C-alpha cells in the first residue's frame, strides 16, 4: 500500500486528516459512504503526474479526522465549509472538485455556496439533488412497508449496533452489494421495513478483483471508531435541506461532468435528479453511463474514470470559463 503525505488541517472547528500530494492547481477529492479518502487510491498518482496538487480528506466523521458526536455537526453548510477550509489551509483561492456519493452532494453544494471559489465539478454517482423536499428520503411513509436505508439510519443507535458488530464483514457486504459484480440492483430489492441493513445482502467469497484483503485492512482501520460519524450525515439530511433552502431554484453553472455506473442503485433511488441533471447543471460537459459498472467507479473502473477526468480537466485549460450562480 503506497504511503502518501498526510497533513492534519484545522478548519471550521475540527481537525481533518488530508492526503496532500503534488503542486499546481488544486483538486479536492471528496469521498462518500461508507468510504474514506482511501477511495481515491487509484486516482492520486495520475492527477499529480498531470500537474495538479491533490488534496484527499477523510471527511468529518470518517477515518483519521475528527468525529463530532452531535448530529447537528454534519449539516451541508458545515460539510461545505470544511472543503473550503482545506483549500484555504493549502493557500488556494480556487479549486476543482472531484467527488463521489455523499462527496458529490457536498461538492454540488460547495459550487453553489461558494461559486467564486469553485472552478469546476467532476461528480460520480450522485447528481445535483438541490430541491429535494424535507422528509423525502427519511420518512417511512414515503416507502410503504419497504426497507430504505436512509430511513433505517434515522433510528439512533440501531444501524451502528448492526454494522459495528463486525466491521470487516459489514464493509465487505456493503461494497459488494452495490457494485457491478453483484446481482443487478439487488441492494434495492424489496424487503420489509422491519429488516436490517445487511439482511439479504451477499457476503462475497472470493472478493471482487477491485477489492483486496489489504484494502479491507485499511478500511477497517478507517472505521476503527465505528459507523456513528458517517451515519450522522444521514441523520442531518433534513437539517441540511432546511439550511440550504435558499438554493432550491439555483443552477450549477461551473463546468461540470457527471458519470454513473449502469448498475449503480442510485439509478433507482435518485431517478428524478438523474433525469434533471442537465437542467440543474447547464454547463455539463459530459453525462456518462458506464455499462456494467456499479457504485464504486473510482475503484471498479479506475482507468475509465481517470481518462474521463483528465480529459475534462484538459478541456478546462483550453476553454476556461468563469464560475457564477444563477436562478431559474
Which residues make up each language-model segment?
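Active-site loop/turn elements of alpha/beta-hydrolase fold enzymes
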Residues: 59, 126, 292
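Catalytic active-site module of serine/aspartate enzymes centered on a nucleophile-bearing elbow/loop
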Residues: 283-328
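Short acidic-hydrophobic surface loop/beta-edge motif
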Residues: 5-11
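Signature tryptophan residues that serve as conserved aromatic anchors
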Residues: 33, 37-40, 102, 108, ...
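A short loop-to-beta-strand scaffold at the N-terminal edge of the catalytic core in hydrolase folds
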Residues: 11-20
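Flexible "cap/lid" subdomain of the alpha/beta-hydrolase fold that forms the substrate-access gate
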Residues: 2-4, 26, 62-98, 102-285
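Conserved HGGG/HGGXW glycine-rich cap/lid loop of the alpha/beta-hydrolase fold
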Residues: 19-66
Amino acid at each position: 500500500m503506497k504511503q502518501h503525505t498526510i497533513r492534519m488541517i484545522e478548519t471550521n472547528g475540527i481537525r481533518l486528516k488530508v492526503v496532500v500530494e503534488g503542486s499546481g492547481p488544486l483538486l479536492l477529492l471528496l469521498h462518500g459512504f461508507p468510504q474514506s479518502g482511501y477511495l481515491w487510491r487509484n486516482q492520486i498518482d495520475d492527477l499529480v503526474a498531470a500537474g495538479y496538487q491533490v488534496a484527499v480528506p477523510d471527511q468529518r466523521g470518517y477515518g483519521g479526522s475528527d468525529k463530532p458526536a452531535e448530529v447537528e455537526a454534519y449539516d451541508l453548510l458545515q460539510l461545505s465549509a470544511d472543503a473550503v477550509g482545506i483549500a484555504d489551509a493549502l493557500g488556494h483561492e480556487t479549486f476543482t472538485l472531484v467527488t463521489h456519493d455523499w462527496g458529490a452532494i457536498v461538492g454540488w453544494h460547495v459550487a453553489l455556496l461558494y461559486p467564486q471559489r469553485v472552478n469546476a465539478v467532476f461528480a460520480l454517482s450522485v447528481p445535483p439533488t438541490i430541491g429535494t423536499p424535507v422528509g423525502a428520503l427519511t420518512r417511512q411513509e414515503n416507502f410503504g412497508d419497504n426497507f430504505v436505508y436512509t430511513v433505517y439510519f434515522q433510528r439512533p443507535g440501531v444501524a451502528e449496533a448492526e454494522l459495528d458488530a463486525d466491521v470487516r464483514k459489514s464493509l465487505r457486504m456493503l461494497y459488494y452489494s452495490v457494485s457491478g459484480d453483484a446481482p443487478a440492483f439487488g441492494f434495492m430489492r424489496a424487503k420489509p421495513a422491519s429488516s436490517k441493513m445487511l439482511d439479504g445482502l451477499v457476503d462475497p467469497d472470493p472478493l471482487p478483483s477491485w477489492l483486496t484483503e489489504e484494502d479491507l485492512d485499511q478500511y477497517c482501520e478507517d472505521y476503527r471508531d465505528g459507523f456513528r460519524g458517517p451515519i450522522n450525515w444521514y441523520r442531518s439530511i433534513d437539517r441540511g435541506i432546511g439550511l440550504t433552502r435558499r438554493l432550491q431554484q439555483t443552477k450549477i453553472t461551473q463546468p461540470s461532468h457527471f458519470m454513473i455506473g449502469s448498475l449503480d442503485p442510485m439509478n433507482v433511488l435518485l431517478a428524478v435528479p438523474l433525469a434533471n441533471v442537465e437542467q440543474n447543471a447547464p454547463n455539463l460537459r459530459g453525462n456518462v453511463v458506464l455499462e456494467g459498472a456499479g457504485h464504486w467507479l473510482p475503484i471498479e473502473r479506475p482507468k475509465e474514470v481517470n481518462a474521463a477526468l483528465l480529459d475534462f480537466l484538459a478541456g478546462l485549460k483550453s476553454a476556461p470559463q468563469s464560475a457564477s450562480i444563477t436562478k431559474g
